[in-house]
Amino acid sequence: MALAKQIMGASLMDQKTSVFGSNLCLNHVLVNKHRLRLRKTRKNGSMVVAAISEDLVKLXRVEKEKPVTFKVRAVLTVRNKNKEDFFKDTIFRKIDAITDQIGWNVVIQLFSNDIDPRTRAAKKSNEAVLKDWSKKSNVKTERVNYTADIMVDSDFGIPGAITISNKHQKEFFLETITIEGFACGPVHFPCNSWVQSTKDLPNPRIFFTNQPYLPDETPVGLKSLRYQELKDLRGDGTGVRKLSDRIYDYDVYNDLGNPDRGNDFVRPTLGGEKIPYPRRCRTGRVPSDTDITAESRVEKPFPLYVPRDEQFEESKANAFSTGRLRAVLHNLLPSMVTSISKKNDFKGFSQIDSLYSEGVFLKLGLQDDLLKKLPLPNLVTRLHESSQGGGLLKYDTPKILSKDKFAWLRDDEFARQTIAGVNPVSIEKLKVFPPVSQLDPEKHGPQESALREEHIVGFLDGRTVKQAIEEDKLFIIDYHDIYLPFLDRINALDGRKAYATRTIFYLNPSGTLKPVAIELSLPQALPGSESKRVLTPPSDATSNWMWQLAKAHXCSNDAGAHQLVHHFLRTHAAIEPFILAAHRQLSAMHPIYKLLDPHMRYTLEINQLARQNLINADGVIEACFTPGRYGMEISASAYKNWRFDLEGLPADLIRRGMAVPDPSKPHGLKLVMEDYPYASDGLMIWEAIQNWVKTYVNHYYPDSAQVCNDRELQAWYAESINVGHADLRHKDWWPTLAGADDLTSVLTTIIWLASAQHAALNFGQYPYGGYIPNRPPLMRRLLPDVNDPEYLSFHDDPQKYFLSALPSLLQSTKYMAVVDTLSTHSPDEEYIGERQQTDTWSGDAEIVEAFYAFSAEIQRIEKEIEKRNSDTSLKNRCGAGVLPYELLAPSSGPGATCRGVPNSISI
């Protein structure tokens, strides 16, 4: 559906800018020049000045000498595939090599910044054909340069655009074009795009030079091309998208369920008045057979649509496929074995450890004789035999085990991970005690917490609770209101048991945290019945195991909220509308598009993969996390409280009470907890991004009125809100876009979310969560009450009870395999402070220089983070058995490194 037009009406860009006004101005100037031109004649030794009539001016223009032509050379850099599919690639490549010789070529044409006064259209070169395509068709290098000789008139001016028609059968990936031979020097066209065959996309592709232009500064010869390119990218909101398409449009999340498989696979539509949610990329697929409001499913290995240039490049796709292969193998074997065996629980912690040392085969007791009896695909057995020691089927040892195998058991490590782990964004300063729920008491029972002063006062170093709050010593992670409305349904699921948890922490004099109470809440069964219980640090063996179970439930709550709310909703889903709107409303020559471009890479592709495999009905999130089929409803419930104006790091820290404004402090903030690794490192990166964006914005918008008058920019921001976040479009907290400072703030927030915030929340998933007891994604048992029949089994063998409460073997291995893949950097990762074609991405030398300064600042920050991780006074990141905090260290190599800040949400 044409959702954008339904909500927004016609785009601002749909108001065509006529070139006639500019041509008339040009003609007026020419006539004036002719009027002022004096013809000197000598007659009888004196100079006679003759006036020139309008007719003579016109005649002079007609008789103007025809310009001569000269030749310039185009060099096109095309990237080859490393591995070709025989039928898709090899055969078509050979066909293209043959047909290229008979005229089915790649044709290019240059367009000038200037217009031809006679045609009132851009000056154009002759069409030219790429040379030697057939000769170079078998070249195996990663990149191949093709050339073309182009004839242009001497008055052509400066080239501003180039069109390409690919008359071959096969698409090709075009990295750059350089034009040589003009007096102005080499002209660069950064492309980084798939050029489709004209049989798929008949219109020629348009590429612009690296010179950025605001809309009202667009050279007159490029205006119609600028409009046409955006029109092509918007589409008309109808039809089923093909994988070769380049169209960006919006839709709701109506493709997570599969009603055609039965009621168990029905999921509500996310997005709309009933369940608000951000919009996703439209595919146009037909409805399901049984529910016209649900889009039909496309299951792996078949891909969902995203615009062609959003799809993974080859090295990224290969790395992701390898990770998925490992995940498939890790999932396949346990599922086969558990299908023939009822032994589905871990028998001891040593069995969990064996997943890393022995691999999946030995962990499952699959010796060679038993292995041969299982109905495994030949591929699996061959991989096992060929991989050295079965390495492909082993799990890497998570970093949480690398320094101290038993760190996860300690209270101080449980607390440390709330500020230096994979989810450091839930903790808040405790402001009210006891905590109070904001839920409707008619539906969810009393709002009062069961926490009392007597529960925690003994752990406050002689302070009262009131004193501890006033001295900023108490903190809380509160999941009560997020989970409680869903608990009845969650706990009715087979093998799922959950509480709505609150955990209170006390700040020690050393700067570390310790948990002092955990509240576990269930829905009230009957009015007046007890539904809450409070646990405090243990004093004996029995209370120790109860405390460990309570911590596990708190971690399970945290794992779900982290994945569904902070990770997917607040980064992946919330950013997608801004990306869609950028492609639809900002020309590739717009300076703000050039700024955002590296921060949009791969996000649409990874989000469609999430819809297909992770957040869908019976997908990984439902299978591995406590909320099960209700997980995305929890995510949508949190969206009602999402606020873009509070998503920047300083605003978020202030909102959570973790910092207060202080102009005298670095970054203008004073952290309430000085040794808060995520916040202290994050503020350095935030400030670097902010300074870079401010320099960039002020360069192109020296006058704030230019921001208001930039029709593309305003259309982008308006569409992001009114269409992409349509369900919250009437909120009064949306920032205005009325000047350079507003624009700097909006862009800094978007870049922060896409880069550092996502990195902090994503790349620690396996290093911390790969050891299931440290961070169980789901729980299968509640804490036993003394009067419960199962209390005796807990009392007799608490370790067995604890392990039976954790995810099963199958659930654990599936989760471990997936988060291992999701925590991995690909070889082509582009990190903050880097970008493709560093020297030529922009034709503005001052901006290129400013980017190098930004890169240097990022490198300085990396060294500062290394220094902090060696500072023994910072006990939350340095100490015996303590993992250094590197999730915001900017650079990384490939793999699950627990560090590295990519430019974009690329995994």
Curated annotation (Swiss-Prot):
UniProt-listed Enzyme Commission number(s): 1.13.11.-
InterPro entries, per database record: LipOase, LipOase_C, LipOase_C_sf, LipOase_CS, LipOase_Fe_BS, LipOase_plant, Lipoxy_PLAT/LH2, Lipoxygenase_dom_3
UniProt note on tissues of expression: Confined to glandular trichomes in flowers, and, at low levels, in leaves.
Annotated metabolic or biological route of this protein: Lipid metabolism; oxylipin biosynthesis; Isoprenoid biosynthesis
Transit peptide interval: 1-49
Broad enzyme group: oxidoreductase
UniProt-annotated location(s): Plastid, Chloroplast
Residues involved in Fe cation binding: 567, 572, 758, 762, 907
Primary location recorded for the protein, binned into one broad class: plastid
Any GO BP: fatty acid biosynthetic process
Cofactor binding summary note: Binds 1 Fe cation per subunit.
Molecular function via GO: metal ion binding; oxidoreductase activity, acting on single donors with incorporation of molecular oxygen, incorporation of two atoms of oxygen
Cofactor section: Fe cation
Catalytic activity: (9Z,12Z,15Z)-octadecatrienoate + O2 = 13-hydroperoxy-(9Z,11E,15Z)-octadecatrienoate
Gene Ontology CC: chloroplast
Domain Lipoxygenase, first and last residues per copy: 212-907
UniProt keyword terms in alphabetical order: Chloroplast, Dioxygenase, Fatty acid biosynthesis, Fatty acid metabolism, Iron, Lipid biosynthesis, Lipid metabolism, Metal-binding, Oxidoreductase, Oxylipin biosynthesis, Plastid, Transit peptide
Task performed by this protein: Component of the monoterpenoid pyrethrins biosynthesis; pyrethrins are widely used plant-derived pesticide. Plant lipoxygenases may be involved in a number of diverse aspects of plant physiology including growth and development, pest resistance, and senescence or responses to wounding. Catalyzes the hydroperoxidation of lipids containing a cis,cis-1,4-pentadiene structure. Mediates the peroxidation of linolenic acid leading to the production of 13-hydroperoxylinolenic acid.
Family: Belongs to the lipoxygenase family.
Official protein name in the record: Lipoxygenase 1, chloroplastic
Organism per entry: Tanacetum cinerariifolium (Dalmatian daisy)
